[in-house]
C-alpha cells in the first residue's frame, strides 16, 4: 500500500524493548519513516506510537479547483466525437489557468488548453497540479500525444478528476499510467454528475 501511494496516514506502534534476532546482531527494532512523511510520536502504555501523514489533506482545495474545472466543461460546444471536459492548472505560487475542450482548436483537449495558457505565461509546471473534470486520456487519434503523456512530460505532481473516462471512444488507462509513474492521483466522484450533465448529448 505504501509503495503504491494508496495510504494517506500510517500509524505504527512499536515496543521499544523489542530486539531483532541474533542474525541481525540483536539490533533494536525501529519504524522506518516513509520519505516525505510528517510524523507525530507519542508514548502510549509503554509503546512508541508514530502517526505519519503521507499525503497532506487537500480536499477543500481539490474540490474548489475541481468544481471550477467541471464548470469549464459546460462551456464546450457539444460534439458527437468528443467529451466536453474542463481543466484547471494550479501552480504552487497561487496562479491558475483554465481550459475546456476545443476552446482554441478543434483537436485540443481541455488539459492541453490549460497547459498552453500556463506555458504562455512563463509558468514552471514541474510539481504543479492539474484538475480535469474527466480522467486524462491515455490514447487519442486527433493528436500524437495523449493528455497523460503531456502531463508526465511537464512533470505535474498531482492529477485530480471527477469521472473516469467511459470506454465509448477508446479504452482509457490515464489514471493507472499516472499512478504507475508516481503521480499523486485523486478522484472525487461526488462531482461526477456535473460531468455527466455536460456530456448528456452522448447518452449514458
Residue ranges and their predicted role:
Residues 84-91:
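Short beta-strand scaffold segments in enzyme catalytic cores
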Residues 99-115:
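N-terminal beta-alpha supersecondary unit
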Amino acid at each position: 500500500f505504501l509503495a503504491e501511494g494508496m495510504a494517506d496516514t500510517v500509524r505504527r506502534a512499536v515496543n521499544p524493548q523489542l530486539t531483532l534476532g541474533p542474525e541481525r546482531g540483536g539490533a533494536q527494532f525501529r519504524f522506518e519513516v516513509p520519505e516525505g512523511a510528517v510524523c507525530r510520536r507519542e508514548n502510549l502504555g509503554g509503546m512508541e506510537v508514530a502517526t505519519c501523514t503521507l499525503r497532506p489533506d487537500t480536499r477543500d482545495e481539490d474540490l474548489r479547483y475541481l468544481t471550477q474545472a467541471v464548470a469549464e466543461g459546460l462551456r464546450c460546444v457539444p460534439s458527437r466525437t468528443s467529451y466536453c471536459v474542463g481543466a484547471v492548472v494550479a501552480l504552487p505560487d497561487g496562479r491558475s489557468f483554465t481550459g475546456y475542450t476545443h476552446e482554441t482548436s478543434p483537436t485540443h483537449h481541455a488539459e492541453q488548453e490549460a497547459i498552453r495558457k500556463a506555458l504562455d505565461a512563463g509558468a514552471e509546471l514541474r510539481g504543479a497540479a492539474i484538475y480535469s473534470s474527466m480522467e486524462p486520456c491515455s490514447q487519442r487519434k486527433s493528436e500524437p500525444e495523449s493528455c497523460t503523456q503531456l502531463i508526465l512530460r511537464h512533470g505535474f505532481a498531482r492529477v485530480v478528476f471527477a469521472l473516469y473516462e467511459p470506454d465509448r471512444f477508446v479504452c482509457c488507462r490515464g489514471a493507472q499510467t499516472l499512478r504507475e509513474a508516481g503521480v499523486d492521483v485523486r478522484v472525487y466522484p461526488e462531482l461526477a454528475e456535473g460531468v455527466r450533465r455536460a456530456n448528456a448529448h452522448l447518452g449514458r
